[in-house]
Amino acid sequence: MNVSDDYRSNWESYWRETSEERGDAIWDSDPSLTAEPHSELLLPHADTGRVIVDLGCGNGTQTRYLATRFARAVGVDLSDAAIDHARRATAGPSVEFEQLDLTDTDAVRDLHGRLGDSNVYMRAVIHQSEPAARPAVATAVAELLGESGRAFVVELTSASRDVLQRAAAGPAGPPPKLRRVFHHDLKPAAAADDEIPRLLTEAGLKILATGETVLPQTEHFPDGTRIDLPARWFVLARE
């Protein structure tokens, strides 16, 4: 299957209207708050000599950090506009980017064929994917791992919806970066808590470790407190 035209269009329009400034996207947090601590959870299980594929890489902020911890990093995203952002911000042979629809089974299989068994980093992709597409996204993780790769997957929990609703209910309405998410009809924290581990295991993945965390955002409540969204992380291998 492939994602719907509306879903693809929403992400294209979002990234076309996003500036080159770090943090303009609400989830574009500094790697010291995201990919760095996530890498520390993945590294005990992963071979750093393998490539790591950043699924849903956006403008590549986390991908560029991952390239400092692994032999090579490849960022992929559904949005051509996001990949354009990532390429403009990146220099060096250890990082590259390409457009990829994770629900396109043949394209994912082709990427695995080119890279071999890879490590995978996926931050907050399944939770906002269209319901019919979520199994294919989980399957893409398994396909890219092959027999030897390891994955770090972190997804928002249902508690994030309460945080987002509280942020949107301020006297002035949603803060600007969150308002832009709603304007483009993106749907954060849409998956049920039990759906994520079920999809991962149904895709043939084994959970090696899991825990609770938050995903810091680049937006704030009216009182200046940073918006941190509750999430659950998983370190995974193929069964």
Residue positions per predicted region:
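A conserved beta-strand element that flanks and buttresses the S-adenosyl-L-methionine
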Residues: 120-121
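Hydrophobic adenine-recognition pocket in adenosine-nucleotide-binding enzymes
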Residues: 125
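Class I (Rossmann-like) S-adenosyl-L-methionine-dependent methyltransferase catalytic domain
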Residues: 1-113, 129-136, 140, 146-239
